[in-house]
Structure formats: C-alpha cells, structure tokens
Amino acid sequence: MKQLLPIGVLALVLAGCGAAPERQTPSDELRDETPEVVAEREWQRRASSGRETEGEALPPVLRDGTLYIADRRGRVSAYKAESGRLVWRFGTGEAVSGGPGVDDDLVVVGTRKGRVRAFESPDGEQRWEARTSGEVLSVPAVGENYVIVRGNDGRVYGFDRDSGSRRWVHDVSVPSLSLRGNGDPLLANGQVMVGFENGRLQALGVDGGELRWDVTVSEPRGSADLDRVRDVDANPVLFGGALYVVGYRGNVMAINPANGQVYWDRELSSHAGLAVDDERTYVTDDRGRIWALDRRTGAAIWRQNDTEGLQPTAPTVHGDRIVFGDNRGRLTVLSAQDGRILARIRVREDVTISEAPVSDGNGVHVLTDDGYLMRYRLRDRNDD
C-alpha cells in the first residue's frame, strides 16, 4: 500500500537557493497601509459538498466560459463563469477522487476504486466506464480520440474516447513512499507528458503509449526513504513552444516538448506548481515563497517571502498580477513585475484554499475546501 508523506514534513524542506530581489512585508494582521487593488465579489455559490476524509477540494476546470466542478461525494456541476448561473448538475453515484476532465460533450472523472467514468454533457447520461488498477487522483486528459488517465500506481492509460475501450497502458516503477497526489497528464501535439513519483517526466505517444523521451526533474537525496521522496506532482505547463515543469526536491525546467531537450534548469523544490506568462515563470516553492524567473533563461527576477509557511497554492496569472490562495482562506494578489503585495482578500474564515484560483481574464474564481465557489473582479484602487 502506498504510504503518505505527512504534510508537516513539507515545512522542513528547503527549496533551491538563488539570488533574487526579495519582497517582504508584515503579515496581514499587522499591515495598516491601504491595498493597491480592490476586490469585488461578484457572486458566490455552494458548489460542492466540501471537506471530507482527506480534505482537499478537487480542482475547478474552465472551458469556453464554463466552470466544471466535481466533489468527492460524486456530484459534477457546471456554472457560467461570468454570472455563476448553474447550467447543470448530476450525480455519478460514486466517490470521485480525480477530475473532472472536460471536452465539448464529455465529462470524465476517476474514482477511489479505480474506475474511470465518462458522462454526456449536459444531461449526465453515462457513456462508458473503464477500470484502472488503482485510485485516480489526477484530472483525466480528454482529447479528440483518447482519454488519458494517470493511475496512482505509476500506470498511464489510453482509453478510446467514444467507447472507453483500453488502447494501451504504460507502466512506470514508482517508490512506495511519496507525496499524496499526482500531476495531471498534459495532452498536446500527439503526445502526453506525465510526471512520476520517481522524479521523472516522460512523453508518451498518444496513439500507442510508446516512450518518446524521458527527463530527470528530481534526483533522490540521502539514504533514508523519507529523504529520497522526489515526486513530480505539479502540473506541467506548455507555453510559447516550451514545456515548464518543477519537481519536489528537484528543479524547475524549461524543456523542448518535441524531443525532451532541456533549455534551462534551476534548483528549486515545489509540489504546488507553477504558472507562465510572456516574460516570467512563477513558482510556489516548498517553503511557501513565490518566485518569478525569466521565462527564457531561468534567472531569478524577484522572490516574495511574506507567504512563507502559509501553504500557498500554485500561482495563477491574471493580467499583470499574480493570484493564489492559502491555508488561511485568503486570496493574495501580487504585482507580476516586482512581486509586491497588492492586496490580501479574506475569502472565508477558518478554511483552506488548496486549489489554484482560475482566471478567465476578467474575473478570478476561487474554490474553498469547504465547497464554496466565488468570483472576484480586481481593479486598481486609484480607478475609483
């Protein structure tokens, strides 16, 4: 049985070092300056059943102006991102642990018992069901011909999109001790990119699951099992012709997605994840600090230290700002240019925000672990 790394251990892990201008301000309880950004809540909905046994919300997915939410009790819902209007909701009849993966007319979820279930959108009629050998903790990737599913035991499955028949399986040996959770498979340009608990990122052919290339993101350190944990759990990001990835106790890298060539790499440990814009790569490290790196070289531009210890989510790019949630139920807004804190918004009391906010370019959507989904519009205070 897979063992789980206690969350308290994460606070003891040091991220990679590097020179960068540091932004440091007092905690929100002590700050008395006026925030530079004002957040207006446009709507709020009770979108999911909220915290259950292991606690975290499942990530919301934005597609074509609609937000898709699954909860661990098996409900799947769709909301209009701008208005918050409920478009549809249906029950899967089973505890959901991964998803939803969404395409034009298909919603796919994974379950704790290793089932993959595909439903018609919007009526919720089940199209097919397939089996994997273990719990599904990531979001299935839904493509034109295939649904790609990452199992919790190192296997990656390619299922026929229309029938659910298994076309291929790729098996990777993974260590028994790792972080709980898996990065989502990324489907693009005829291949699927997947990170594993052994510290490697692989690209597989989407038609047959054959290995295209393999890159080491995180190397094992020390002799004790705990010291050798090295998961690649953060979701890879494809941007501007490069693939960006970061590993726990490893590196942040820019990779050529065609052949696995490493453009640049930098020692930096993260399990939360990263985001990318035209100029910079933003990373939440394992101490909770937020970094901005030059997208083309990996050179450090700034680092915000005031978030240390708050378990911030992966960053999300929202125009010229960076937004993320934390374990105090807050949405924090940073300047993308220099990392200064523009605002901290109390979303809800005594809750955690485990999943990164979702931006549609106009509004920022936040899902709390107790199941509340809300949309904020951000504006400069001097626009009043």
Name each model feature, range by range.
Residues 2-8:
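Sec-dependent signal peptide recognition
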Residues 283-291, 299-333:
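Loop/turn-rich, solvent-exposed surfaces of beta-rich toroidal or solenoidal domains
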